[in-house]
Amino acid sequence: MPPPMIPPKLPPLEFIAAEALYSSIIFLICFLIYHRLREVYKLSDYRGFHFFSNTFLFLGLAYFLRFVVLLLSASGVMFEEISLEGLRGIMAFSMAFLAYSGSAAILYTIYSLLWRWLERFPGEVVINGVALVIALTSLLSRMPLVFLISQLALVFLLVAAIFVNYSHFRHESRSKRAYPLYILLFVFWLLNISLTFRFLPLEFRFAIYTLSVAVILIIAYRVLRKL
């Protein structure tokens, strides 16, 4: 999931350009992965693909919003035609939506691993409810640390879900093909969580962008060619 939005101070132009390019690439790749997984789900009727595809739906939505906000920043609309209070409101809304969509993406990944134990459980209702609570908490607190802690907690839950699923289904051919995808997603989220640390030099951020794009491209290759 993307890091929370930058405070209302115009960042360097190269930073905005890199962020916009990065966000657009991730959004487009997520759209392709989502479309392919929906096709596989319709052909196989395997519910795990439905939940897993929603991971990339919400991840793509998060990066699409970030791309739009960054374009507004680059054009100067937000900084020249909107008051400071209005700008803060837009940033707060963006942070809340990113917290919601990013949390929903991780929760859908977790549920795609555990749904066979929770078939009678209203999983999607709970996923959206928990994501909404995280978003509202981030909005009301206005503290990036709250967002960071919530995402770290969800990522650790993902690790636990991977181990639980692996211990029961590691001999299934479908599961064997899926585990590398989950591990790559774990790496992707760790890389993006590290972007919430504002003290990172631009060179480090650009390196993380490059690694993140490489990881999501590998995921796309495995989904588009091997599923």
Curated annotation (Swiss-Prot):
Principal cellular location given in the protein's record: membrane
UniProt KW keywords: Cell membrane, Membrane, Transmembrane, Transmembrane helix
Bilayer-spanning residue ranges: 15-34, 55-77, 92-114, 121-140, 145-167, 180-202, 206-224
Calcium among keywords: no
Gene Ontology CC entries for this record: plasma membrane
Source organism, top-level taxon: Archaea
Membrane topology note: Multi-pass membrane protein
Keyword Iron-sulfur: no
Compartments it resides in: Cell membrane
Protein name per the record: Uncharacterized protein AF_1460
Originating species: Archaeoglobus fulgidus (strain ATCC 49558 / DSM 4304 / JCM 9628 / NBRC 100126 / VC-16)
